[in-house]
């Protein structure tokens, strides 16, 4: 049997985190990952599936996806209020591909690819998401990130993934802005993904 879950071993000192759920290690990871792929802003999430869900939420559209793809993609598209259309396309395997085009921006699925400055190949208003599932180039304890040069879009993802609350380092300073979701990346996820990101160039 092929061992797909081949991760580096780490000992995580939970006492070193300033917050177990959304500590400064998450922000540190977001910054380093954005610097690596050439994007200005990023929001780390508990999974790439949640990035698909939030990016397509209530768009009321039909999204074309390859027939050879994990079911979580179709699930997220459907659960976000859209329809799925399947196409016989295998060119996406091992690379990134356009998940959907809107009038003024596109969504790029790059769960299979992480390379330096790759976001610069696209428009500043585009959204690109990555997966940190254990089998991915930057494997981790699951997790994902969505990046863009469009700060307003990323700020919305940050609020939506943190229960719909305005972002603040201090819990009591946050205010509920709209009904959101608990989809943020936690500190342990960020720690493992960050260590493996720093090893990516050695692969």
How should these model regions be labeled?
Residues 1-59, 80, 153, 176, ...:
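Conserved PLP-binding active-site segment in aminotransferase class I/II-type PLP enzymes
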Residues 15, 114-116, 127-203:
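Active-site region of PLP-dependent enzymes
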Residues 37, 123, 139:
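Structured loop/turn residues at beta-strand edges in well-structured enzyme cores
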Residues 102-105, 123, 127-129:
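Internal catalytic-core helix/loop-beta-alpha segment
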């Amino acid at each position: 049997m092929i061992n797909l879950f081949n991760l580096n071993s780490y000992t995580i000192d939970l006492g070193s985190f300033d917050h177990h759920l959304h500590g400064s290690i998450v922000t540190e990871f977001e910054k380093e990952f954005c610097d690596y792929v050439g994007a200005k802003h990023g929001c780390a999430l508990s999974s790439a599936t949640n990035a698909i869900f939030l990016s397509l939420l209530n768009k009321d559209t039909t999204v074309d996806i390859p027939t050879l793809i994990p079911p979580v993609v179709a699930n997220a598209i459907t659960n976000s209020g859209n329809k799925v259309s399947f196409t016989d396309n295998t060119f996406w395997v091992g690379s990134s591909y356009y998940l959907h085009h809107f009038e003024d921006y596109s969504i790029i699925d790059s769960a299979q690819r992480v390379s330096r400055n790759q976001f610069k190949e696209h428009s500043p208003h585009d959204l690109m998401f990555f997966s940190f599932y254990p089998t991915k180039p930057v494997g981790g304890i699951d997790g994902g990130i969505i990046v863009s040069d469009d700060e307003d879009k990323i700020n919305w993802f940050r609020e939506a993934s943190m229960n719909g609350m305005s972002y603040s380092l201090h819990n009591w300073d946050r205010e509920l802005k709209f009904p959101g979701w608990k989809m943020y990346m936690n500190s342990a996820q960020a720690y493992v993904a960050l260590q493996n990101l720093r090893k990516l160039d050695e692969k």
